[in-house]
């Protein structure tokens, strides 16, 4: 394998959280008087940090979301995670193969550290990623699509950007990885391939990833 580090996005790549999160986000925004469909939420907010939700709502309506918006939303999301959240199918096999091949991996997510921990604890992924290998947009000044988060993760893991590959499912994340000078594999399970066109490779089933990485010898 030509890569010395595999950097995983979290939501939609490791845990199947995007349907849950975007369903709840669309519902909460609509409840607050900002009509938003599930499809709107996927298009506008998937892969982004929470500040983007605040910024877009204010830009479009001139109104600010309530001060407790994030806290209420996360409470609802975490409760739903406990009931519904599962790993993305095939992830466990990929992680086992990387471990067997002694290829390091880490997480770099727009989500908060708390959100990542809750999701991993619920799905059992916490056995694969300790806190030293989890990086959040909270750790850097600018989130995706800026490259800062991926560059920070590579620096903390001690690997040069050109030796990293990122696994992403959002246009914002693909843009960030390309800007960081990293190869990026675009996961198209929820995102149309055309929106991830800047990715190095595209794949639609997580079970394909191990073979794709092996092709890069």
Placement of each model-derived feature along the sequence:
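Residue-level marker of alpha-helix boundaries and capping positions
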Residues: 16, 85, 107, 141, ...
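Residue-level detector of anion-binding/catalytic polar loops
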Residues: 35, 104, 183
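Structural motif
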Residues: 44, 108-110, 167
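Hydrophobic, well-structured mid-protein blocks that either form specific transmembrane helices
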Residues: 104-109, 124
